[in-house]
Curated annotation (Swiss-Prot):
GO MF annotation: an example: deaminase activity
Protein known as: RutC family protein jhp_0879
Pfam families: Ribonuc_L-PSP
GO-annotated cellular components: cytosol
Length: 125
């Protein structure tokens, strides 16, 4: 059985996908851009603003599922530039405590809406 998770405190999906899907003991959060739900636009044009908003969007979606950031077991970070790796790490690290989730980070040629970062997460109930 699967359940759609949708938070009004995070932006709507920009394509044919759900913000998150819960199934059995897992919640799969789709990639989140740094879009501010109140404006529908990026929180800012810089990596700091976009990363922070991406993480806040994940946090809001998890909250809708009754979970917190401490439930996250795996993340994937997509970056327009690996030059932003240190900044993203600093912000990312402020959302988690040890033991940190497993993670993969990739540089990609382009992200939706020309975003600088996209972050997806898997959490356990």
């Amino acid at each position: 059985m699967k359940e759609v998770i949708h938070s009004t405190l995070a932006p709507k999906a920009i394509g044919p996908y759900s913000q998150a899907i819960a199934t059995n003991d897992l919640v799969f959060v789709s990639g989140q851009l740094g879009i501010d739900v109140s404006t529908g636009e990026f929180k800012g044009a810089d990596i700091h603003s976009q990363t922070t908003q991406s993480m806040e969007n994940i946090k809001a979606i998890l909250k809708e599922a009754g979970l917190g950031m401490d439930s996250v077991v795996k993340t994937t970070i997509l970056l327009k530039s690996l030059d932003d790796f240190a900044v993203v790490n600093g912000i990312y690290g402020s959302y988690f405590k040890e033991p940190y989730p497993a993670r993969a980070t990739f540089q990609v040629a382009k992200l939706p809406k020309d975003a600088l970062v996209e972050i997806e997460a898997i959490a356990i109930k």
